[in-house]
A protein has these predicted regions:
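Catalytic cores of Mg2+-dependent Asp-rich isoprenoid enzymes
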Residues: 1-66, 77-221
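Single, functionally critical "micro-switch" positions that shape active/binding sites
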Residues: 74
């Protein structure tokens, strides 16, 4: 993780990363590897999860990418102010938007594809969480709160036409409380959790990717 973060700090620029693959590797270096570490800890704590190690490892990387992509979308303008952008140049080029993003609100037109990708990863994150036994509520809630807050943040991003700082799309304290309450009420019931997250993510664009293929591409393990 430290090696990856150091590498990308030296590559940081206002011109964005080369392509989606480069973005995947960046998100893995700063977040996906954390998912792998937590999975190892969860399995050590709950040995019965060992049988699902490969599936959980793949989904854990997707989980981390979903959270990190949400942060990248939320903080795009704050990053731009310090001369950094993590969006892929290929996406910006496809949308016909001038780069770099400073002072260029039309860049928001290219966010939809990244929102869809992030949402797809967060769906994998939910599947990861549902693989944890329902009686392990501490582990489940730890994951669910992060996913719920990320989904609601994506909703704000998708429906904000001209946000210029991460603060503009930050979810409210009331929304945070609702996430915690909703997850506590439904945390033991897979069907209830699926319905809850379907409601929170209604209307969100979604692009699913193969978590196993992504894992094989970016993972260092």
């Amino acid at each position: 993780m430290s090696h990856g973060m150091t590498r990308y700090q030296t590559l940081a620029s206002p011109h964005g990363l080369d392509d989606q693959t480069a973005l995947d590797h960046y998100c893995y270096a700063v977040a996906g590897v954390v998912g792998e570490m937590l999975t190892a800890l969860f399995i050590a704590y709950r040995p019965s999860l060992q049988a699902q190690r490969e599936e959980l490892a793949a989904l854990s990387v997707s989980f981390g990418l979903g959270l990190q992509l949400t942060n990248i979308l939320k903080d795009v303008w704050d990053d731009a102010k310090r001369g950094v952008c993590w969006w892929p140049q290929t996406l910006v080029s496809k949308q016909g938007i001038v780069w770099p993003p400073r002072g260029n609100p039309t860049l928001i037109a290219s966010r939809q594809e990244l929102v869809a990708i992030a949402h797809g990863h967060l769906r994998d994150a939910l599947e990861y969480t549902l693989a944890i036994p329902a009686e392990e509520q501490g582990l489940r809630q730890f994951c669910l709160w992060a996913i719920g807050m990320a989904v609601l943040t994506l909703q704000k991003i998708q429906h904000s036409n001209a946000y210029l700082t991460g603060h503009n799309v930050k979810i409210t304290r009331r929304a945070v409380r609702n996430v915690i309450l909703g997850c506590r009420v439904t945390g033991r019931y897979d069907r209830g959790l699926r319905l809850l997250f379907a409601w929170w993510s209604r209307g969100l664009a979604c692009q699913r990717r193969c978590s196993r293929q992504l894992y094989q591409t970016v993972s260092c393990w």
